[in-house]
């Protein structure tokens, strides 16, 4: 049975990098990230290589079930490497792994927070059609009720999908406006 592996990586844009992905079709299910092949991509389109020498490599480092496609399909997180296999300059994960290894006796912890705003057209959902909310930010933070919170079911779905995919999500927080959350 064919399986779709969505290879995901961080591009070279600055100051804010973006996510990129492409789908590789595998001949069957895999049980370990070590079974996944390294794969190439054109780094000139992601600001990770020049046009004349644009080969970059995707080195799988973590995988989880794909909660959207379901079945045996997977999401594959990758490090970006140069053609010779060394970490690309945009690959900050490789440096982090080196530091974590150097200080492993201290048992370092790393956390990532994904903060996002749900939009309605060109403005945050729940905002007045013209201008800004009449209230300051404080009343929205960790609040409850339809007056202060919007799209909570969407955020619940987001958290559920993270957990189903095996991500170590530990919380979500309603932040400073009706549709700003962090997971």
Descriptions of predicted regions:
Residues 1-175:
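Glycine-rich, acidic/polar active-site loops that bind/position phosphate-bearing ligands
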Residues 174-183:
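Single conserved hydrophobic/aromatic residue that forms the stacking wall/gate
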């Amino acid at each position: 049975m064919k399986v779709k592996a969505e290879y995901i990586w961080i591009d070279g844009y600055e100051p804010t990098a973006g996510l990129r992905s492409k789908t590789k079709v595998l001949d069957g299910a895999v049980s370990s990230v070590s079974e996944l092949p390294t794969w190439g991509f054109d780094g000139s389109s992601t600001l990770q290589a020049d046009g004349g020498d644009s080969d970059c490599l995707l080195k799988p480092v973590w995988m989880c079930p794909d909660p959207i496609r379901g079945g045996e399909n997977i999401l594959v997180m990758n490090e970006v490497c140069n053609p010779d296999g060394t970490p690309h300059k945009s690959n900050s994960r490789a440096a982090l792994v080196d530091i974590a290894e150097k200080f492993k006796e201290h048992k370092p912890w790393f956390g990532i927070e994904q903060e996002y705003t749900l939009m309605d057209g060109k403005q945050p959902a729940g905002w007045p059609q013209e201008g800004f909310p009449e209230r300051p930010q404080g009343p929205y933070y960790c609040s409850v009720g339809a007056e202060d919170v919007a799209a909570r079911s969407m955020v619940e779905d987001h958290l559920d999908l993270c957990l189903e995919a095996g991500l170590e999500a530990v919380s979500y927080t309603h932040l400073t406006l009706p549709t700003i959350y962090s997971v």
